[in-house]
């Protein structure tokens, strides 16, 4: 009834070892290809690009402090950025103002008892409006 005994079969281990060796060889080949392609790019002239030269010159020169000071001069002042947006007309709803009572939805009929008098309905609508902070 048991699952039986497991036996070590030497043939399976050889297959796994072969797969591992093949994977290692593939990884080594890929690494060699990457290294040779990088060196070929440098020979072709990618290493002599303006960006590469600028980066090398930046490392050699100590002018980085002056470039950092000039960096902030290229951006507009934050005051101007926010005041320009305030002057624009915004056509959306203003949430600081309460909605008009005519816009408010009416409660479903099954929420309201059928035996309500008009005075009770007015009282309920008043309570609903005060809950919604609407001026009556």
From Swiss-Prot:
Its main location: nucleus. InterPro entries: PNRC-like_rgn (IPR028322), PNRC1/2 (IPR026780). One of its GO terms (biological process) is nuclear-transcribed mRNA catabolic process, nonsense-mediated decay. Keywords: Activator, Cytoplasm, Nonsense-mediated mRNA decay, Nucleus, Transcription, Transcription regulation. It holds the Pfam family PNRC. GO terms for cellular component: nucleus; P-body. The keyword Glycoprotein does not apply. Residues 13-22 have a biased composition (Polar residues). Residues 1-22, 58-78 are annotated as: Disordered. It is found in: Nucleus; Cytoplasm, P-body. A motif (SH3-binding) lies at residues 96-102. Residues 58-72 have a biased composition (Low complexity). Belongs to the PNRC family. PNRC2 subfamily. Involved in nonsense-mediated mRNA decay (NMD) by acting as a bridge between the mRNA decapping complex and the NMD machinery. May act by targeting the NMD machinery to the P-body and recruiting the decapping machinery to aberrant mRNAs. Required for upf1/rent1 localization to the P-body. Also acts as a nuclear receptor coactivator. This is Proline-rich nuclear receptor coactivator 2. It comes from Xenopus tropicalis (Western clawed frog).
